Regions:
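Bacterial N-terminal signal peptides
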Residues: 7-16
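Non-transmembrane domains of secretory- and envelope-associated proteins
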Residues: 22-120, 235, 246-299, 304-308, ...
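Solvent-exposed N-terminal domain segments of exported/luminal and surface proteins
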Residues: 23-225
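Short, hydrophobic/aromatic-rich segments at coil-to-beta transitions
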Residues: 194-200, 226, 305-313, 336-340, ...
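Loop-centered beta-sheet repeat module
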Residues: 209-267
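Short, surface-exposed coil-to-beta transition loops
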Residues: 210-212, 224-225, 321-326, 338, ...
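A short, surface-exposed beta-strand/turn
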Residues: 217-222, 325-339, 394-396
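Extended serine/threonine-enriched, polar tracts that run as long, contiguous segments within proteins
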Residues: 304, 309-320, 324-336, 343-345
Length: 416
């Protein structure tokens, strides 16, 4: 049945690609953003309440990547199954896709041309050579909201014992380009400077790192490198720094580009779209902060559910990159990467990144939100036997920030 469903989905995508170029049809919008409106995926062996564990792993063989299934089989973690959650993104984003996607193209250097807002390429033909690159651009421009503010604790967690490192921080991502208008308000205030988004990070504890801050500008043109600044209490100065995406953060082993599944430059990888699968995924949890358990308390153990997923493989172009490839499993409805498999230079499965997105109806203050609501992250390193984990205390979406929030002098003022 799974092969039949995936065949239908792929066939519909290919058929639509061949027959619709001038406009994005209601059928395509329905397929891309409302795949569960008419019927939710189901399997008799995976009824809600079923537990997937080392004793029952065989019933999930067709619904998990082998690398994750092996961890369940080994007893590293277990989870229950829940009914699939319908989580459409914002109406403004969907409308922007419908209105503008037909004019989006790839330039000779792989940049977007004609992009305004919404999902750049709702039509993906697995047979097309550039389908992988298009999927990577969809990942870049998934509906992240205009502003996300997160109060969280970053932990470096070994297999046993207390965390090796624990950092409380305040983290903000705000977009200033290519966001759809909502209620007549234009959030695109950084178009003049070509800044797609700004990212701010402020350490609150421990004492020896308190008030250390960083600011990043990600430019809309992928060929342009990020600009980064840091502030440290010891210097009381803001310094411009170079941050390599292949570098690690806080001795965690995880690369800067690993967060959110992939947070790097599209240009740094060769991309291949591997197709559509129906898989179990940790999406739609009815909590405000993800629950972790299993080995090292590294794994997401809130209920998982059947989702239609797109599989995207990225191969680093740099010969000295720490990875040989990354494979992202993207939720079709939201284009959020739910789990990402990372392979070392010898081709061994080295890390798994879990990004968890919950049901906004169970997230106080975010009940109205129609973007993927982030509830936690775990980057498990099987070679170092630790995990880089983000434990969320509070998250807010689309709450406006002062115009000067990201000014460099504000970093100095906050550090006083």
């Amino acid at each position: 049945m799974q092969q039949r469903l995936c065949g239908i989905l792929c066939g519909l995508v290919c058929l639509t690609w061949q027959t619709v170029r001038a406009e994005i049809s209601a059928e395509v919008i329905q397929q891309r953003f409302y795949p569960y409106a008419a019927e939710k995926p189901a399997a008799a062996e995976l009824a809600p309440g079923t537990t997937i564990s080392k004793d029952t792993w065989e019933i999930a063989k067709a619904y998990l990547p082998p690398e994750i299934l092996d961890k369940v089989k080994a007893g590293e973690f277990a989870f229950a199954v829940q009914e699939t959650t319908d989580l459409p993104v914002s109406a403004a984003y969907i409308e922007a896709t419908k209105k503008h996607a037909d004019q989006v193209k790839l330039s000779a250097e792989g940049e977007l041309e004609g992009y305004v807002a919404g999902l750049p390429f709702p039509l993906l033909d697995p047979a097309e050579p550039q389908a992988g690159l298009k999927a990577a651009w969809n990942l870049r421009y998934r509906d992240f909201g205009d502003v996300m503010q997160v109060w969280n604790t970053f932990r470096l967690v070994p297999e046993t014992g207390s965390p090796d490192r624990e950092i409380e921080n305040y983290y903000v991502v705000a977009y200033g380009m290519h966001r759809p208008l909502t209620d007549g308000v234009n959030p695109n205030k950084w178009e003049k400077d070509g800044v797609l988004y700004k990212e701010f990070y402020h350490i609150l504890t421990p004492f020896d790192l308190k008030n250390t801050m960083s600011l990043k500008h990600r430019y809309v043109r992928d060929q342009a490198n990020d600009d980064n600044w840091t502030y440290t209490p010891a210097s009381r100065k803001v310094r411009k720094v170079i941050v390599r995406h292949e570098d690690t953060l806080y001795d965690s082993g995880a690369l800067n580009e690993d967060y959110f599944g992939f947070w790097g430059y599209v240009r740094s990888y060769s991309w291949k779209f591997l197709g559509v699968q129906r898989l179990l995924a940790p999406v739609g949890a009815r909590v405000a902060s993800a629950t972790f358990g299993g080995r090292g308390h590294w794994y997401p153990v809130d209920p998982w559910e059947l989702r239609v997923m797109l599989v995207l493989e990225g191969t680093p172009k740099a010969s000295d990159h720490p990875y040989s490839k990354r494979v992202l499993y993207l939720d079709q409805q939201t284009f959020a990467p739910v789990y990402t498999l990372l392979y070392d230079r010898q081709g061994r499965h080295q890390r798994t990144v879990f990004d968890l997105y919950g049901n906004p109806q169970f997230n106080p203050g975010n009940e109205h939100v129609r973007v993927p609501v982030w509830i936690g992250e775990s980057i498990i390193d099987y070679e170092s036997k630790n995990a880089s984990m983000t434990i969320i205390t509070k998250i807010l979406y689309n709450v406006p920030l002062p115009d000067d929030f990201f000014n460099l002098d504000k970093m100095v003022a906050r550090g006083q």
